[in-house]
A protein has these predicted regions:
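Short beta-strand segments within Ig-like beta-sandwich modules, predominantly Fibronectin type-III
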Residues: 240-246
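Hydrophobic, helix-prone linear segments
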Residues: 1-125
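Short, intrinsically disordered/low-complexity patches at protein termini
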Residues: 104-108, 116-118, 191-194, 257, ...
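Exposed aromatic-hydrophobic patches
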Residues: 249-261
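Beta-strand-rich recognition domains
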Residues: 32-34, 50-58, 62, 68-75, ...
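Surface-exposed, charged secondary-structure patches
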Residues: 102-157
Length: 346
């Protein structure tokens, strides 16, 4: 078992924060993380899917009109313009993420918004449509500096859905092409087949489902998953939906947690042809008082010799769990609910 799994404290150290309203940058990072992952893989030779190749000039005009209106709505703080150009699903996901951290939506979304890139700085590559013409992905190419990294050539992908009689932006993605020279070369040549081969450039195969609006949380919660070689589909309290794919990530729990009984259900799917070492799932109550620490209330920890099975579980958050978050707590620290018995250290 990897050292990470030997102590749940290692997980909680990643979540030690004082909860506050999410900034737009944090929101975008949370929403894009999963989308950007698969494009870092090289495509399988000859692998294509069925997509519509639309009239490129018309698709480009549509995409840039919607994107530029959306971009200006963020700069000007125009909620009406933002809603008219943003998909219903994305609006609700952003709203739930902010509300689940006791933020105020849409105020906190616009308060610290960062300026989105200008399309004039990128070269248009091409567009594909999916879902019988109700989804569209437009790919651009250009240099971009992300974080503290040096400026590098990136693919910039805009994902749209057609709803309410108009095209709306659902999300944007950046992919660093430094380690993908063949992909970069084919994008420069405006080779539309690369867009069909790489799923990161592809349109959605279905309209994203709009999640239900969550209430402000009783307790702010986070779920942490480390699932190498596996895909995990999860629902917490029947409201917060998550999907983890061969990755290590922490998500805010939509609607949070509550004192008393909570539920979690998940399905674990092995990824073909991949090694499957140990995995871990942990649910934490996040501290809202400076100096307090997270407390784990549920875990599912396995090593590589165990068969990973999902299920539906109920776990109870007691007053002692909350009290133990205070560093001055002197009582017996309550244990999290273990989905499977913990193994003794060798």
């Amino acid at each position: 078992m990897r050292a990470f799994f030997s102590s749940i404290v290692a997980i909680s150290s990643l979540l030690a924060f004082t909860a506050e309203a999410a900034t737009p940058a944090a929101i975008e990072a949370e929403l894009k993380r999963r989308a950007s992952k698969k494009t870092q893989e090289q495509p399988e030779e000859g692998a294509t899917a069925r997509f519509i190749v639309p009239d490129q000039q018309r698709a480009r005009t549509t995409a840039e009109t919607v994107y530029n209106t959306w971009r200006l709505s963020l700069i000007r703080g125009s909620e009406q313009a933002w809603r008219s150009t943003t998909s219903n699903s994305r609006q609700m996901k952003i709203r739930n993420l902010i509300v689940s951290q006791r933020g105020s939506f849409p105020r906190d979304f616009f308060r610290e918004t960062q300026e989105a890139p200008k399309l004039e700085n990128f070269a248009y590559v091409g567009a594909l449509q999916g879902c019988n013409g109700y989804t569209m992905a437009c790919t651009y190419l250009g240099k971009m500096q992300l974080g503290n990294d040096k400026a590098a050539e990136n693919a910039f992908v805009l994902e749209f859905v057609f709803e309410g009689g108009r095209w709306k932006l659902d999300q944007t993605r950046f992919f660093n092409l430094t380690k993908l020279p063949d992909v970069r070369k084919r994008l420069r040549e405006r080779d539309l087949t690369i867009l069909q081969e790489q799923d990161g450039f592809q349109p959605y195969d279905r309209i994203p489902t709009t999640p239900p609006a969550c209430n402000s949380p009783v307790l702010i919660g986070k779920v942490f998953v480390d699932c190498p070689g596996r895909c995990i589909e999860m629902a917490i309290n029947g409201i917060s939906l998550h999907e983890f794919d061969d990755e290590r990530r922490a998500d805010i729990i939509s609607g949070g947690l509550k004192r008393g009984v909570n539920t979690i259900s998940y399905k674990i799917i092995d990824r073909d042809g991949m090694e499957r070492p140990g995995m871990a799932i942990g649910i934490f109550v996040a501290p809202e008082t400076e100096g307090n620490t997270p407390v784990c209330v549920f875990d599912h920890i396995l090593d590589q010799s165990d068969k990973a099975e999902g299920g539906t579980f109920s776990f109870t958050i007691q007053n002692e769990h909350i009290a133990s978050m205070n560093p001055r707590f002197t009582g017996t620290r309550p244990q999290p609910y273990h989905a499977v018995p913990l193994k003794s250290k060798p």
